Amino acid sequence: MNINKQSPIPIYYQIMEQLKTQIKNGELQPDMPLPSEREYAEQFGISRMTVRQALSNLVNEGLLYRLKGRGTFVSKPKMEQALQGLTSFTEDMKSRGMTPGSRLIDYQLIDSTEELAAILGCGHPSSIHKITRVRLANDIPMAIESSHIPFELAGELNESHFQSSIYDHIERYNSIPISRAKQELEPSAATTEEANILGIQKGAPVLLIKRTTYLQNGTAFEHAKSVYRGDRYTFVHYMDRLS
């Protein structure tokens, strides 16, 4: 890297842009360790604080990650998720050539709240499956998913359902295909619990997704809240110009 101390462009920003270029062109590969802050500072004759600012910004953008006591490393490329199509997590990972998996955090059969009953269009009170899982890709935690599904639309559920695609089970159980979903996305920061589960730092960027999914007959069968790692996922929406 070359740093121009006479440039009006801040030094930390020059470091960021050059590291981005090295990551993009493959000079820096995923999981490759970077020199330490001290080494960068000595190499360019700048302060460690300036180096730390550049690296911290790239960590926040998901391009780098830190391991306590070991240093800073290059992140794996983010996976793009198109917002137009409706697929399950299992289907999505398989389409990428990855091995999907799930780890059950909690399961309860609960009584519906008024809010859930209104969203799902079920009676109140009625029995609701509440399933909280960590969704995995090649054994790497990608998201925390908490799903609420009316008992009458799923029947009894067991460990085998939690380890695979619940969407497949829902379609078989009801003999009706899944057709559409309403989805809301908003940025958030990982809580201590979320960070521990996902293997990221507390306060790291995450994507909070709320989704209500419907069968072809218009029946809402699931309301889910998911927390996706911001360093591994990016959501893309393609738009056509209206005539």
Curated annotation (Swiss-Prot):
Matches recorded under Gene3D superfamilies: Chorismate lyase-like, Winged helix-like DNA-binding domain superfamily/Winged helix DNA-binding domain
Binding site for N-acetyl-D-glucosamine 6-phosphate: F89, T90, R133, V134, R135, E145, S165, I166, Y167, E222, Y228
Binding sites annotated in the UniProt record for alpha-D-glucosamine 6-phosphate: F89, T90, R133, V134, R135, E145, S165, I166, Y167, E222, Y228
Domain (HTH gntR-type): residue spans on this chain: 9-77
Disruption of the gene: reported phenotype: Deletion of the gene results in the modulation of the expression of many important genes, probably indirectly due to an excess of the crucial molecules acetate, ammonia, and fructose-6-phosphate, resulting from complete hydrolysis of GlcNAc. Disruption of the gene induces a slight but consistent increase in MapB activity. Deletion of the gene improves the growth rate on N-acetylglucosamine.
A Pfam short name: GntR
Consequence of substituting E222D: No or little effects on GlcNAc6P binding
Induction conditions: Expression is increased by growth on N-acetylglucosamine.
Activity regulation, free text: Binding to DNA is allosterically inhibited by an effector molecule. Binding of the effector to the C-terminal domain leads to a conformational change that modulates binding to DNA and thereby regulates transcription of the target genes. Glucosamine-6-phosphate (GlcN6P) and/or N-acetylglucosamine-6-phosphate (GlcNAc6P) are putative effectors of NagR. Binding of GlcNAc6P may prevent the protein-protein interactions responsible for polymerization along the DNA, but not the specific DNA binding.
GO MF annotation terms: DNA binding; DNA-binding transcription factor activity
S-S pairs: none
InterPro entries given in the database record: Bact_HTH_transcr_reg, Chorismate_lyase_/UTRA_dom_sf, Tscrpt_reg_HTH_GntR, UTRA, WH-like_DNA-bd_sf, WH_DNA-bd_sf
Key words of the record: DNA-binding, Repressor, Transcription, Transcription regulation
GO biological process terms, semicolon-separated: negative regulation of DNA-templated transcription
The entry's DNA-binding region: 37-56
Domain description: The N-terminal region contains a canonical wHTH DNA-binding domain. It is linked via a 21 residue-long linker to the C-terminal domain, which binds the effector molecule.
Protein task: Main transcriptional repressor of genes involved in N-acetylglucosamine (GlcNAc) transport and utilization. Represses the expression of the nagAB and nagP operons by binding directly within their upstream regions. Binds to the DNA consensus sequence 5'-ATTGGTATAGACAACT-3'. Also acts as a weak repressor of mapB expression.
Assembly mode: Homodimer. Forms dimers via the C-terminal effector-binding domain. At high concentrations, probably forms polymers along the DNA.
Name the UniProt record assigns to this protein: HTH-type transcriptional repressor NagR
Organism of provenance: Bacillus subtilis (strain 168)
